[in-house]
Amino acid sequence: MGLEPFSPDSTIFRDESVLRDGYQPDRLIERDTELEQYQSALKPVINGAPPKNLFLYGQTGVGKTLSSRMVVERLIEDQQNIDGVDVQVIELNCKSLNSSYQVAANLINQFRPPTEQIKPTGYPSGMIYNMLFDELEALDATHCLIVLDEIDAIGNDDDILYKLPRANDNENVEDTLVGVIGISNDFTFRDNLSARVKDSLADEEIHFPPYDANELGNILKQRAGEAFHGTSAQRLDDGSYELQSDILEGDVVPLCAAFAAQDSGSARQALKRLYKAGDLARDEESDVITGAHVRQADEIVERDKVRDELTRLPTQSKLTLYSLLLLEREDETPSKRNRIYERYVMAAKRIDADVRTDRTIHDRLSQLTLKGFLDVDEQNKGPKGGSYYEYEFSIRADLAQEVLQEDERLAELFATDETSTTLDSF
């Protein structure tokens, strides 16, 4: 069978890019309060005063990065009409960086031309910070705002979040007013910052809560009006949106919004479901997108999300999951912590991994439960039996095995006949 010719989509998508990651709408809806807070916090800059240091936090997909980009772009546009104010903005995504040193080195290279870039390692930390301060001092600008997205990637090494916000106060930089805007997806990162960093960074904090189903519905309607053929969205006086569509059945948007609201309140996840539903309809050569397409899309998106999160887990967490996987195969779940720990010790020794304490694995189990991979149930057997927790998978065990087998370090655990048995019966 030969390949079919490529042809433009004339039935489903008019502009599918508006549903994909990276698209920046002209208007960000359902974030008016946060945008107003953000703009208010940056007003000192336009008055020529030292900038406030800001900390934005909230789950992935709730509008933090997009809000920041919109407000900062508006500031850059408006400052052109203000005498004596010249703002430069440096944006750095810290997702792949795991130390303050790496953040500082990457910032230095953003200021420098390609021929003068520095290596990411090999300098004393004091020298790295001095080089960064020199670059800030040499700027032909009155203000420099440094936006550090996904700053939680640096973990406990938060030195950069102390030194940069205090660069002016400590006279490390005198001719340029420096402000830091930290953006984090991790609530615990904010709580675990050292006291000196909290005092330095958080002049003002802006919390981006998860979207509810109604808010997600409006976001989806706004995007659907641009994305699909035969579809338009009108903004009403109360700020909500009314959708008219020849190809979207009435339950499509509410279902996408409901699934995403129950999941994490993420606009990104809601848009992925709507996009995948359209994709499925296109593949079927259907003239309409139905609720059935959305339900199928939800299964695919959820599986992909879980797979991605499982893949990014550290080795010790994967070993903990593997231990529960063995107990699941033996039909011994829900299982107590001590049983899981016994399997964990054996597995860790087999791959020459560090064997952590029972308490550490308990913490891992708690983290895996919070992430939604495990369910936990408290058992109370009275004065004689005592109380204890039992754990079992809340995701499909075959998916957990599939991802764990792909990990190079854990692959040998599945090499024997005993552990490579399929989990179709789960």
From Swiss-Prot:
Coiled-coil region(s): none
What keywords would UniProt list here? ATP-binding, DNA replication, Nucleotide-binding
Q: Which CDD domains match?
A: AAA, Cdc6_C
Q: Report a single Gene Ontology molecular function.
A: ATP hydrolysis activity
| Swiss-Prot/TrEMBL GO biological process terms | DNA replication
Q: Which residues bind ATP?
A: V62, G63, K64, T65, L66, Y211, R223
Name the NCBIfam families for this protein. Answer: orc1/cdc6 family replication initiation protein
**Similarity field:** Belongs to the CDC6/cdc18 family.
Q: Any idea what job this protein has?
A: Involved in regulation of DNA replication.
**Name by which UniProt lists this protein:** ORC1-type DNA replication protein 1
Organism name: Haloarcula marismortui (strain ATCC 43049 / DSM 3752 / JCM 8966 / VKM B-1809)
